Amino acid sequence: MPDELAHPPLAELLGDRYTESAFERSFYRRDLGVVPPRLAALIGDTLPQAVARPRTADEVAAILRYAAERRLAVTPRAAATTAYWNAVPLAGGLLLDLSGLTGPVEINEARLTATVLPGTRWAEFDRALRRRGFAVLSYPTSAPAATVGGWLCMEGYGIGSLKYGGVQGQLRELEAALANGQLTRVPGASEKPGALRATGFAGSEGTLAIITRAELVIRRAPAAIGHHLLTFPDMAAATGAAAELAAARPTPFYAHFAAESYSRFLRRAGFTPAADSPLLAITYDGDPDEVARGDHNVGRAVAHWRGEALSAALAQREWDERFLALRLKRAGPSVLGAESWLPAARLADYADGVAKLAAQQGLPIATYGTIVAPGWATVMSLYGCDESRPLPYLLALSLTKKLYDVAFRHGGRPYGIGVWNTPYLAQAMSAEELAMRRATKRTFDPANILNPGKVYAPPRLLWPPTFRLGMELLAGARRVSKGWL
């Protein structure tokens, strides 16, 4: 191996799946969120020293052993479908691209489980199951790109979660490589105090271990499916109907809502929304009787909440486009926003608060979301920005903090932490939960090798007291300057 390489043993292990090319490394400096380079440089060293692309669990373990011996920071990454820098390096180091850990899906019909490798995309996983008469229980709204391992390390709520629960509850067993390179079996649950459980990966964002295999509960492919698209006079009616249907039996497989602001944003991006009023998309699946009972519930909700059922063709189109929410970025150049976990009962209040903020700031803000658990929803509010203009971008960035303030007032919190949401740790979880998470991190990664700088504490620039003051000043400056910037 050439002497000039920083890590010759890794090059020998991986061959052309290891690179120190500046060009190739540069692609890993960002995720879905676009940040001006000068601002990114103030947060951390986002350019990895090298990129490793393992294909097997043994290669992952060997890489981690090497990194542990040298206290080399390792940032795990696959599709990087968030905008919080969960998978962006902060300390240079080694970027571990796990998208190559794919292979056949193994089905255990007796246990009704499937074993899958972490680089497998959720849409591919579900297609592999359906070819044999099975289906996943739930999947993320980014399923065409998001990987199994990535979602298991997030909070894990999405399409199907309302009916079947979060993905952590579907885990039977994991195989994972610890920070010291040890491959270990991780059961779905453990009675042993301090033991690592598969459910403990929820929200860990790649900071505890690297998942190398997962066994998940699956289901028989549904015999019937029914889609409904409803429109309502206001968000109070739309979210009221959503909460009513989510609490009724049978439980919908999918319950997605969008404020009229989202429809307006879609039009700006060149698309034609199904309606310009608040929308609610409901899907039932299962046996034909269950779907028929769901249809009956929808009819009652439409009558009770003064709604209107749109055509079956529009309902089918809405279902087919369920992964395309971010197409509104075409109104661009880009978008910023906030994703919150909110009580379903407060969705209308939240939407009203966001509408008032948009009017105050003179900026369109699109709001949409999904009811993902009994009484709870994930909600996204997005607004346009231009990262090529640093000052307007910085002023616009303050609105994300304002959106979270609206969520906090209505019992919400950020959904996901990464780097950009670390200023809100005190609102995102209790002091006891944060202390427990930090203790778990110290136990399983005492050298802080895996994904350093994420989840547990903010970087200096995002320290909460100064961050809050800075964002308030920027928001005020933006409000004053909106006519000329």
Regions inferred by a protein language model and the residue ranges of each:
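Feature of Fe-S/electron-transfer and energy-metabolism proteins
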Residues: 24-34, 52-55, 66-69, 83, ...
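Activity-critical C-terminal alpha-helical subdomain
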Residues: 420-485
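C-terminal substrate-recognition/cap domain of FAD-linked oxidoreductases
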Residues: 20-38, 220, 226, 231, ...
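FAD-binding subdomain of flavoenzyme oxidoreductases
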Residues: 103-110, 114-256, 467-468, 478-485
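N-terminal flexible segment immediately upstream of the FAD-binding catalytic core
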Residues: 1-65, 81-112, 262-270, 313-335, ...
